[in-house]
Amino acid sequence: MVRLVSGSQERLDQGYLNIAQLCDLGQAMLALEGPDSVMVEQVMSQIQKQEPAQWSLAELRAMYKLLQSAVGFDGKYCDLLNAMHTHAVTVTSHMNSATVSELLGVLTSLDQTQAMPLVISLCKRAVRHVAHFTDEELALVLGALMHFGHSDHYFVDAMEKHVPTMAFTSHPETVTKVMQFFGRRNILSPVVFNAVAESFVYRAEEYTTSQVARQIMPFGKLGYLPPNAADVFRKVETILHTRFSHFQPRTLLNVLHSCILVERFPVNFVSKLFSSYFLQQLQEQGTGIDRYVLAQLTQLYMTMKLECPYYEGPRLLSQYRIKSFLTPGHSLETPVDIHLYNSVKSGLVDLLGARSYFGSKVLSPYCYTLDVEIKLDEDGYVLPASYHDEVHKRIALCIDGPKRYTSNKRQLLGKEAIKQRHLRLLGYEIIQIPFYEFDKLRNQASVVEYLHQKIFPHSYRLSW
């Protein structure tokens, strides 16, 4: 070994090594001595004198793998990486499936957020290879696209053709990654979701509890029930019965919360969640009980009270309940689109005659925030928003911008659907103002007329 290292050092000193050889030597010395090796630094110094634009695809791959092995050397070679990214974009059309997945994996592990042009180019190339990726390669590709927050409709189309052919046979983690990708990107594909739902019924016993959760959660997030929903959730219930103690507390909470988003009520298991033993487990696990976890617990509790009157299990103790589901960052409600809200507000002032006749961003006693609340008396007249007595009817306007829907279809996300469902049960009249209707209105007069037809369809409009 000493003679081999000595000989390599001599050839390195003489400058006889090409890029591929330098990469091989760098990998070997990283394994022997780590990233602080003097010889590795010498290798990198010689590589930096080269012009990446002149490298072959094989040399480019070797260099990416070297940098990945040392996790980018803590950002010391940003200029080199950027030059490599620029060159890689020009040769993606020559990349096979293994190279595409490998490079996306490298970009992910090095967190190359500045390399989006390359990520986009690799995604386009991946479309041609979707049917040819191995399970491991496809999982890498999907993981990278989730990491960088990218997808395009050509890739989605290719996945819709491929998933029905692989859902029953691919590695469980690959199938799980498919569902995670569509869920993370808010892409509702009935073709994909139905195929995975069918395979879930037959394969769920071989899945880990984490895989079960990650396959079920997108159904709740996107508010979609497959045709075989009864079989799917019966299988979920069976797994919960047989492997309840195997679930991590947060994972279990995510599964049960996803169920209620699509009106599946796991009553037998919710009672266990509200036990002091489970809540103690939640506190002891990792991040403990953060505000999002408390919101999930509170919404589960509200669901039991509103939709499951036959629930007789323990109550959620008051110290675990929150007052608002609308929180910064990860939230059980999507904040109102400000531009859309301002346009609706302007129309409401003209319709109702004054700003005082409706409340904005009103926190209800039931944790949900109302975009707009209008109060009516017994005769149907609008009351000032400040009135609390003589209120006979409450109207909640849901000003639904694009972020409240799946990215490719006009379907509300699960968290928005449950909000509107609960508000109806609590006595509110729900009136939706979807962006795709409102955006068609061309002037203030049409806005006011639209709002009048939505809110007061059976009454004449007064002119102020």
Task: Annotate the PLM regions.
Residues 1-464:
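Eukaryotic RNA-binding helical-repeat scaffolds
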